[in-house]
């Protein structure tokens, strides 16, 4: 549900920020030629946002240099599908379905890995999987989840297919908890979650009147990392790719961070920006 709310907010924001195409198209040549110390500090402070917007599991696709329709990331899609499918399985056979997921993942490992401490690894993997699905989906699963009944082959296959999104999500790089099969797993947030948290935290620490400038810095930094031939000539006024990158940056950060950003975000200027404490630690 949260995924759809974010998507709805993003689509709603599209209309509200249409006027950015004019106001955000100016000042990039000036930004390129002259950077104040405060601007450089803002860019450094927004590094987590740069990292997040370029991650594969970003919540919205950020097509710098290309005009594309906003869409949910593959991680969010499979997460939603996983929870939706799990909710449709009766409580009394959810344990069996989760056992099938564990088995399906373990079968994809090499023969040698499956032979080493298979029973212990499966038990630990089962525990981690239960914790992950419970936290992620908020769906009841028994704490002592044991395979309680034998099902027919057709039922087992149906359950396994029904929870395919869960298997996909748990093996994805941006899964909420790392579940290594069959090694001993360790709880840890993914890099995507860390940089998203850092990005929002850093953005919230920047005064409102300077957030437009900071977001311009993010878009500029990303654009400068593209191959020279892709962004050559981008600094001419009214370039569609330039406008689209700013518009998408504003839209994604507004939806993701729930932080006030002006609808008409002005172009960057060369004014001095006061020093802002930079957060350098990891996610809380």
UniProtKB/Swiss-Prot annotation:
Q: What is this protein called?
A: Avenin-like b5
* Tissues/organs with expression: Expressed only in developing endosperms. Not detected in roots, stems or leaves.
What is the top-level taxon of the source organism? Eukaryota
Task: Summarize what the UniProt record says about post-translational modification.
Answer: Contains disulfide bonds.
GO molecular function ontology, one term from the record: nutrient reservoir activity
User: Which ranges does the record mark as transmembrane?
Assistant: none
- The residues forming the signal peptide are 1-18
């Amino acid at each position: 549900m949260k995924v759809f709310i974010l998507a709805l907010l993003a689509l709603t924001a599209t209309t509200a920020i249409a006027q950015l195409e004019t106001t955000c198209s100016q000042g990039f040549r000036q930004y390129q030629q002259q950077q104040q110390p405060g601007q450089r500090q803002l860019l450094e402070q927004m590094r987590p946002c740069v990292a997040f917007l370029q991650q594969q599991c970003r919540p919205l696709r950020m097509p710098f240099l290309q005009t594309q329709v906003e869409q949910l990331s593959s991680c969010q899609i499979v997460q939603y599908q996983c929870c939706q499918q799990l909710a449709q399985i009766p409580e009394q056979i959810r344990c069996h379905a989760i056992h099938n997921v564990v088995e399906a993942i373990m079968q994809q490992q090499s023969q040698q890995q499956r032979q080493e401490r298979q029973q212990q690894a499966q038990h630990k993997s089962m525990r981690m999987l239960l914790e992950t699905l419970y936290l992620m989906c908020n769906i009841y699963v028994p704490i002592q989840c044991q395979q309680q009944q034998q099902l027919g082959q057709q039922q087992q296959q149906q359950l396994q297919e029904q929870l395919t999104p869960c298997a996909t999500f748990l093996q994805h790089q941006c899964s909420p908890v790392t579940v290594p099969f069959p090694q001993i797993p360790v709880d840890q947030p993914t890099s995507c979650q860390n940089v998203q948290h850092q990005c929002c935290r850093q953005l919230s620490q920047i005064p409102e009147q300077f957030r437009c400038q900071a977001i311009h810095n993010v878009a500029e930094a990303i654009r400068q990392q593209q191959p020279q031939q892709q962004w050559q000539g981008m600094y001419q006024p009214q370039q569609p790719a330039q406008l689209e990158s700013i518009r998408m940056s504003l839209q994604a950060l507004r939806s993701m961070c729930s932080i006030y950003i002006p609808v008409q975000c002005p172009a960057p200027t060369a004014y001095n920006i006061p020093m802002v404490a930079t957060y350098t630690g990891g996610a809380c």
